[in-house]
A protein has these predicted regions:
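Low-complexity, acidic/polar, glycine-enriched regions of mature
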Residues: 1-170
Length: 170
């Protein structure tokens, strides 16, 4: 099965410094290719095979040229041009209000596994998948930037906030 991510989606990386907050929005119009989804159903679990979303670092916009440059430097974009998110498995939560997913995320060549609850709501032409994933960038051997001789420090804690409008495509 193939799915496509519609322009009604949003994917935002949020962070803050000791001075202010920032967010880097992904240009969802770049989701032009369909994504192959392959899974095996095992009772209440779906186990996925090679179901990946590649986010090109250069398609994030942090609202200011200097912040974009710092963002790409932090992620080592010259060496690792994209973030890879791989869906490993999914199963219903006991409360039936959310689905617990297991994701493998690769940032700057470092891979980490996360369990994240997501909400899935049916829409007229597909589903809306929503979630929020807090990440410590130190887990990926990344050092948050410092500015003005260290007076401005960016927190190592970020959040990936996503609302993906997904529909099956032939």
């Amino acid at each position: 099965m193939n799915v496509s991510v519609s322009p009604a989606s949003s994917l935002i990386i949020k962070g803050e410094s000791n001075v202010n907050k920032f967010q880097c929005s992904y240009d969802v119009l770049q989701f032009s290719d369909s994504i192959e989804v392959s899974f095996i159903s095992d009772k209440a679990y779906l186990n996925f095979t090679n179901t990946q979303l590649h986010l090109k670092n250069s398609f994030f916009d942090c609202g200011h040229k200097a912040i974009n440059r710092d963002f790409n430097k932090l992620l080592k974009t010259d060496e690792f041009p994209s973030i890879k998110i791989e869906l490993i498995s999914a199963h219903n939560q006991p409360n039936n209000l959310s689905i617990m997913t297991k994701l493998n995320i690769v940032i700057s060549g470092i891979s980490k596994r996360y369990d994240i609850p997501v909400e899935v709501d049916k829409t007229t032409d597909g589903v809306m998948i929503c979630g929020n994933l807090p990440i410590d960038i130190n887990d990926f051997n990344l050092s948050p930037p410092k500015k003005l001789l260290g007076m401005i420090k960016v927190s190592n804690k970020i959040e990936i906030d996503f609302n993906l409008a997904v529909k099956t495509s032939e």
